[in-house]
Amino acid sequence: MRFEEAFQGWSGGRLTQAEAAMLLGQCERSFRRHVERYKADGLEGLLDKRLSQRSQRRAGPAEVDQVVQTYKSGFAGWNVAHFHSKYRSEFKGVRSYSWVKTVLQGAGLARTAKRRGKHRIKRERAPLVGMMLHQDASTHRWVPEQVWDLVVTMDDATGEHTSMFFCDQEGTASSFHGLGQTIARYGLFASLYSDRGSHYFLTPQVGGKVDKTHLTEVGRALKQLGIEHIAAYSPEARGRSERAFQTHQGRLPQELARAGITTMDGANRYLEHTYRAGHNREFCVASTLPGTAYVPFISGSLPDILCEHHERTVGNDNSVSFEGLSLQL
């Protein structure tokens, strides 16, 4: 029903105020307010005056152009979320991600993303920090003409990266390095979740179960430290790590290029002094439970555990042979 009809019914005594308001789908208070406007200005009085007023919060052309030029001058090719992070942290921008995305898309600098399908049900995070950590690696062209492995150790409860560094190829040494950095910074944790790479587990049959009795050097070290080792049996099981690497592959090459970094040493310094802390600030979430499952490492020498152990037989001359060398004891 149109307002005029309801107004005439009410003013003619055929409808009560409550009935007229109900027919219009509004409360009595709104109906009374509209009656006052209608009596004063007619139908024009019923129009929402806000529609003809410029919002005080609306960005002006100068601000829009500044964002566009900032993106063009130093961030061309960056995804919107990555640029928005720098826009807020480095340029003290106050606009929302959606606003920045709309501006860049309007300028033809960002693509409109395709609608995503229904998301799968996520695995629940560990409720307490230090209960479960992930360790994984991603092979990628992080700088021009260079393919490295990025090794990340991450807390499942919060997503905090406890260690991340580049190396030529992941393996036993890189696993030890990531574990050593994590334990030195936070302490011993309860369990490690990893893929079934040959440096983590021995797998007698391709695609089969891992051998929990014959341990790799990483497995031996974890057992010695009292850390449970959990094997992932599908890429989907490592989804949290995979999504983190998608973020790193979309951001790190641009950040390293912007900083003029082309060497592994320089890239690792950037990870340690700049990138890891910034990533943790932006992406970490609060754990379900307060407190921590980390405990201090106080027994023995950590480097003596996080290294390869090889058994050798001592000869009659008190020497052992190792990789073609004769070592005197």
Segment roles from a protein language model:
Residues M1-L15, V64-G74:
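Short, amphipathic alpha-helical "recognition" segments used to contact nucleic acids or chromatin
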Residues A18-L24, F83, Y87:
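Short alpha-helical "recognition helix" segments of helix-turn-helix
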Residues R29-R32, S98:
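Key DNA-contact positions within bacterial/archaeal DNA-binding proteins
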Residues G42-R141, P204, K209, T213, ...:
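Basic, flexible linker segments flanking DNA-binding modules
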Residues A62, G93-V94, Q105-E160, D168-F189, ...:
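Mobile-element integrase/transposase regions
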Residues L192-R196, V206-L252, M264, N268:
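RNase H-like two-metal-ion nuclease catalytic core shared by retroviral integrases
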Residues T274-L329:
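C-terminal, beta-rich DNA-binding module of retroviral/retroelements integrases
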